[in-house]
């Protein structure tokens, strides 16, 4: 019988944010493929499984995706059940959708298991509500790192009026700043830059759109980091949020 595959989100880093469904999948797995950004402590839930590291880290040397695909197919004949364990959640900038499609086209049974995304975990740890009545009625999740290195339409995002949560944006802070300002986003819009979201070494740099690039340099912001851009990013700072009846 063919192996069952779980594509599992390991959460943003804090092992206590692992879901119960993810824990059950790890308990059942014979083999676990683990991403570079996954906290090794989650492997306590699969002590007898064979663990294979398949590093995927933006801006660094990574395991090629086609190699991961071939490895997945090879595991089909060698394991009864296995997990591909990814940081955060596999279906938000985690290749979970394309991996599930690739496996299903080859007759492999696949189950996707969501995790808590880093944008939500990091914001929550900094007491930032991504939506807030009278302030922000929506959230837009975007990645600044694309496969073809094309740029997002930041000007359109500036006009959207939602909280922006930007993944993989550290290397493009100046481009993001310029494009949002050109899209008429206010220069004093609050920005929170959150490094190592949910981990004990989490760091937080509060700034504004106009100054976020220079402040990040002084702060020595490093990846992995999340950017939260919008009025809600002023949460926790006295008199920093203005509530509007129309929001």
UniProtKB/Swiss-Prot annotation:
Transmembrane segments: none annotated. Keywords: Cobalamin biosynthesis, Methyltransferase, Porphyrin biosynthesis, S-adenosyl-L-methionine, Transferase. GO terms for biological process: cobalamin biosynthetic process; methylation; siroheme biosynthetic process. Gene3D superfamilies: Cobalt-precorrin-4 Transmethylase, Domain 1, Methyltransferase, Cobalt-precorrin-4 Transmethylase, Domain 2. It is a step in the biosynthesis of both cobalamin (vitamin B12) and siroheme. Belongs to the precorrin methyltransferase family. The keyword S-adenosyl-L-methionine applies. It holds the Pfam family TP_methylase. One of its GO terms (molecular function) is uroporphyrin-III C-methyltransferase activity. Pathway: Cofactor biosynthesis; adenosylcobalamin biosynthesis; precorrin-2 from uroporphyrinogen III: step 1/1; Porphyrin-containing compound metabolism; siroheme biosynthesis; precorrin-2 from uroporphyrinogen III: step 1/1. S-adenosyl-L-homocysteine binds at residues 12, 117-118, 168, 197, 225. It catalyses: uroporphyrinogen III + 2 S-adenosyl-L-methionine = precorrin-2 + 2 S-adenosyl-L-homocysteine + H(+). Its EC number is 2.1.1.107. The keyword S-adenosyl-L-methionine applies. PROSITE patterns: SUMT_1, SUMT_2. This is Uroporphyrinogen-III C-methyltransferase.
């Amino acid at each position: 019988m063919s192996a069952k595959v779980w594509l599992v989100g390991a959460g943003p880093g804090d092992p206590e944010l692992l879901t119960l469904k993810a824990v059950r999948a790890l308990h059942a797995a014979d083999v676990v493929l683990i991403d570079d950004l996954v906290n090794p402590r989650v492997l306590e839930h699969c002590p007898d499984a064979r663990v294979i590291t398949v590093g995927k880290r933006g801006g660094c040397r990574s395991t090629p995706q086609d190699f991961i695909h071939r490895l997945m197919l090879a595991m089909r004949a060698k394991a009864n059940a296995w997990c591909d364990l990814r940081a955060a959640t596999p279906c938000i900038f985690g290749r979970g959708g394309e991996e599930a499609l690739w496996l299903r086209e080859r007759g492999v049974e696949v189950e996707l298991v969501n995790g808590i995304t880093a944008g939500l975990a990091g914001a929550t740890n900094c007491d930032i509500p991504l939506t807030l009545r009278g302030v922000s009625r929506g959230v837009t999740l975007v990645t600044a790192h694309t496969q073809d290195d094309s740029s997002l339409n930041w000007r359109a995002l500036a006009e959207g009026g939602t909280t922006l949560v930007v993944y993989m944006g550290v290397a493009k802070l100046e481009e993001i700043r310029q494009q949002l300002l050109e899209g008429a986003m206010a220069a004093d819009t609050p920005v929170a830059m959150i490094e190592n979201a949910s981990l004990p070494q989490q760091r937080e740099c509060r700034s504004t759109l106009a100054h976020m690039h220079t402040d990040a340099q002084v702060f020595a912001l490093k990846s992995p980091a999340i950017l939260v851009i919008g009025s809600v990013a002023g949460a926790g700072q006295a008199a920093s949020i203005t509530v509007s009846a129309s929001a």
